[in-house]
């Protein structure tokens, strides 16, 4: 992926909102690394972009694999995707953990099992629930971005699942 100036059509990911956000996100990523979590970051090197990274608030897109949902204590607003693998018989408990967290902005599930889709969509208390698709929603500062509990700014942008 290409990280840099969002004004270029070839850019996949731009900067985060400010220096404080960058610091908090990078601290979270480092904490997960120090706990031994698998952390994957993907950015294609480009000399023009690399110059921008030095002065901007860029954070590389990051995937972190968690052993348990309980490892997340707060929402992370940035290009970070947390992946939790679970056994099928543990799904009800996982949904309960998500619902009990107090946060419920966005949840994504990828599965080919209709029963799993029904169980998640029927039980998860989140504002934005995406099934087998990318997890994008509203334009920040332009559209409301719905959530549940301590998350979101209003009703969900866009249509159904």
What residue spans do the PLM features occupy?
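Flexible, glycine/charged-enriched surface loops at secondary-structure junctions
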Residues: 3-10, 39-43, 106-112, 130-134
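Flexible, acidic loop-helix segments that line cofactor/substrate-binding pockets
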Residues: 1-27, 43-58, 74-78, 141-144
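Acidic, glycine-rich loop-and-strand cores that form catalytic or ligand-binding grooves
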Residues: 36
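Conserved C-terminal structural/oligomerization subdomain of aldehyde/semialdehyde dehydrogenase
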Residues: 50-161
């Amino acid at each position: 992926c290409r990280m840099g100036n969002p004004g270029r059509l070839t850019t996949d990911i731009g900067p985060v909102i400010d220096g404080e956000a960058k610091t908090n996100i990078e601290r979270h990523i480092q904490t997960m690394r120090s706990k031994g979590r698998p952390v994957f970051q993907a950015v294609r090197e480009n000399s023009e972009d690399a110059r921008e990274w030095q002065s901007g608030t860029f954070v590389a897109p990051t995937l972190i694999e968690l052993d348990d949902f309980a490892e997340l204590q707060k929402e992370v607003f940035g290009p970070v995707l947390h992946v939790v693998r679970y056994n099928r018989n543990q799904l009800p408990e996982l949904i309960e953990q998500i619902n009990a967290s107090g946060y419920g902005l966005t949840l994504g599930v990828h599965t080919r099992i209709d029963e799993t889709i029904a169980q998640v969509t029927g039980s998860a208390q989140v504002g934005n629930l995406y099934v087998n698709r990318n997890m994008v929603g509203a334009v920040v500062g332009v559209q409301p971005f719905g959530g549940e509990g301590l998350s979101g700014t209003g009703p969900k942008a866009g249509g159904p699942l």
